Design a protein with these regions (language model features):
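N-terminal phosphate-binding loop and adjacent alpha-helix
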Residues: 29-68
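ATP-dependent carbohydrate kinase catalytic cores
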Residues: 180-281, 398-399, 404
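Glycine/Thr-rich phosphate-binding loops that ligate phosphate moieties of nucleotide
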Residues: 1-30, 38, 75-108, 112, ...
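Conserved phosphate-binding loops in N-terminal lobes of ATP-dependent enzymes
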Residues: 15, 58-61, 65-72, 136-137, ...
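Short glycine-aspartate micro-motif
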Residues: 2-8, 16, 70-75, 153, ...
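Phosphate/pyrophosphate-binding loops at sites that engage ATP/ADP/AMP, CoA/4′-phosphopantetheine
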Residues: 54-71, 142-147, 194-205, 373-386
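Active-site nucleophile and cofactor-binding loops and adjacent substrate-binding regions
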Residues: 45, 72-77, 96-99, 123-131, ...
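Gly/Ser/Thr-rich active-site cleft segment
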Residues: 9-11, 120-233, 329, 359
Length: 474
């Protein structure tokens, strides 16, 4: 039985799925944790840890399966991370990850050089601290010795696939989806923007520094006789796993929050809210990302001295709007809106509020921020009137599903697959081998329908926006 392997190399762990090539049936899974990445605003790790985790996860997935034939493999990785390699192909320093916001001053410096509208027009996005281009600037500015040693840079999924191909002198490749999150590759032109890169360092030969961008179904090498796909970013793989169609919306609640939709044309948003990403098929994936999602639920469950299930039950015991209590959930700064130094605010608390209201306000604060992102995507001309899918750990919560349905005033779907990113990577592996996308994908079910009125949901979202503007001016 030919098997394809989908790998999800995320911030916290590596997940591996083995699936039947023809049916997509799940054969087995494996998982391995990554080391802690440090305290905000720093988030770094040694890239070699990803390879170790992959080996461990694969060993778990293939235990007692000696007859399994691997046909193809592909990797989806956390976006935006910066891996630096020297002339001998050794790691120069720990990789700076997407949620490392130390480069916030560099993001502003980059914008100041040309202006937000210029950046949006050139690369589809305005730099924020998460983007790779700002991390390049940070290392050049604060670690000149490391910068001078660096001869190649790549993204996390690029590094892992390069190692699977044998590392060393093997070619480094990336894909258009993950490349579009760097801040120096244009989804509109399908090329690196060297004018952008020269803002960071005009003396470097960038043509030899960056990975080649592979086409969506290109075979980029072999591993144990299995074809290697080009890989992609985690959000792009999520869209593949769902089989996202025009009009559909995906809202992912993990450590970070994302909302995205597919588009036939590239987008650019000078306000910096919407990142004009490419997807993994040849189309586009406008996306909004927030830094604070399920960790807000974890924190407030701890504050309220309850577990996550009890936290959800508390939230459902309150009403839509949490009796006018608003949480601005920026625990460790925020990416959208761009507030890297912000901290969370609980606005409007009075003696009549209960634990139920605090729990509800926490969930509503996270969801309101993501729905504001959906509005921004819609303003870019993208159709968002289709199905609404909730993904990630937050989607396992009945309260999160119900509150999202209430605030968006639409039914919401959840997927019947727990590892949608790994599934998407497996679909890409299968398509790379056969030359066409497989018919198998995640199935879904309706998780919640709105029970609050449109008036209540509108008022709740307007209170959130007003509190944000009053406290942060955005």
């Amino acid at each position: 039985m030919p098997v394809v392997i989908g790998v999800d190399s995320s911030t916290q762990s590596t997940k591996v799925e083995l699936r039947d090539l023809d049916s997509g049936e799940l054969v087995s899974t494996g998982r391995a944790a990554h080391p802690d990445t440090g305290a905000a605003p720093l988030s770094e790790t040694n890239p070699t840890e990803w390879l170790k985790a992959f080996d461990t996860a694969l060993e778990s997935a293939t235990a007692n399966k000696t007859q399994t034939k691997f046909a193809a493999i592909s990797v989806a990785g956390q976006q935006h991370g910066l891996v630096t390699l020297d002339r001998e192909n050794n790691v120069v320093r720990n990789a700076k990850l997407w949620n490392d916001t130390q480069s916030a001053p560099d993001a502003q410096w980059c914008i100041d050089q040309r202006g937000a509208a210029w950046w949006a027009e050139h690369v589809g996005s305005v730099p924020v601290a998460s983007f790779t281009v700002t991390k390049l600037s940070w290392i050049k500015r604060l670690e000149p010795q490391n910068w001078s040693r660096t001869t190649r840079v790549c993204l996390p999924h690029d590094y892992l696939l390069w190692q699977l191909r044998g590392g060393g002198t093997k070619e480094m490749t990336t894909d258009r989806g993950d490349a579009s999150g760097t801040g120096y590759w244009s989804a509109k032109t399908n090329e690196y923007d060297y004018e952008v890169l020269e803002i960071v360092d005009s003396n470097r030969d960038w043509s030899t520094t960056l990975p080649r961008v592979a086409s969506p179904l290109e075979q980029t090498g072999t591993w144990r006789d299995a074809v290697i796909g080009c890989g992609t970013g985690d959000n792009m793989a999520g869209a593949l796993g769902i089989g996202l169609q025009p009009g559909d919306v995906a809202i992912s609640l993990g450590t970070s929050g994302t909302v995205y939709a597919v588009s036939a044309t590239p987008t650019n948003d000078p306000s910096a809210a919407v990142a004009g990403f490419a997807d993994a098929t040849g189309a586009y994936l406008p996306l909004v990302c927030t830094l604070n999602a399920t960790k807000v639920f974890d924190k407030f469950a701890s504050v309220l001295n309850c577990d996550l299930q009890q936290f959800g039950e508390l939230a459902l015991g309150s009403e839509c709007g949490a009796k006018d209590l608003v949480l601005l959930p920026y625990l460790d700064g925020e990416r959208t809106p761009n507030l890297p130094n912000a901290r969370a605010n609980l606005v409007g608390l009075n003696s009549n509020h209960t634990r139920n209201d605090v729990a509800r306000a926490a969930i509503e604060g996270v969801v309101c921020g993501l729905l504001d992102g959906l509005t921004a995507i819609n303003k870019c001309g993208v159709n968002t009137n289709g199905r609404v899918f909730l993904l990630g750990g937050g989607a396992q919560s009945k309260a999160v599903c119900q509150i999202t349905a209430d605030l968006i005033n639409r039914e919401v779907y959840v997927l019947n697959e727990p590892e949608i990113v790994a599934l998407g990577a497996a679909r890409q592996a299968a398509a790379t081998l056969t030359g066409k996308w497989p018919s198998w994908r995640a199935t879904s079910k309706i998780a919640a329908q709105p029970i609050s009125t449109a008036t209540q949901s509108t008022a709740t979202r307007e209170r959130f926006a007003a509190a944000r503007f009053k406290n942060f001016g955005v």
